[in-house]
Amino acid sequence: MSEGMRFLLDCHVASKEGKCSVKVADVKDFWNGQKEIRILDPNITACREKRDLMKQYRETGALLDFTQGLDIRCLNDEDIEDINHMRLRALHFAWDNPQDDLEGKFRRFAERFRRKSNIGMVYCLTNFNSTMKQNLYRINTLRSLGYDPYVMIYNKPSAPQEVIDLQRWCNNKIIFKKCPNFADYVPTRKQK
């Protein structure tokens, strides 16, 4: 679970499920040879038994979808090696808190991951304890490393127009590729 979501959901999820994932079953307990497995665990990377689970998922040979994403802060070299031997749908990560210096962790994953472009989508929470400078730093850093940043706006109705423009610029991949610098982006407004 991402830091921003952890903050927002702590009072609900953590009280029910705890802050760490716990292995409750082996893969063979639910997998009957299906070609695809959707893993709904909110943070498999925070599970003490992750090594065993990663091995089991890898050995199925099935197409894996970590629907809740992976926590870049918890991934180590062994995890990346396991991931490199899995058949995967798109990977998802989050960099919600700009105070977390995650550039090194994203760089390490990018260097060790088998794909060298389109590594995965990274959700970036904005309008929640972040400045535009911090937002742009995260977006530009992720793009330079081969990730696909995706802007999420906390409390969008009260967000400044600049943050809304940032979301449109970043999340519209045609615009994002044609206009690589947000300072050069000229948003169009609907006329009333």
Model-assigned labels for residue ranges:
Residues 2-7, 12-109, 119-128, 148-152:
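Core AdoMet radical
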Residues 58, 114, 140-143:
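Anion (oxyanion) recognition and catalysis
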Residues 112-120, 181, 188-190:
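Short, intrinsically disordered, low-complexity segments enriched in Ser/Thr and Pro
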Residues 127-192:
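Auxiliary Fe-S-binding modules of radical SAM enzymes
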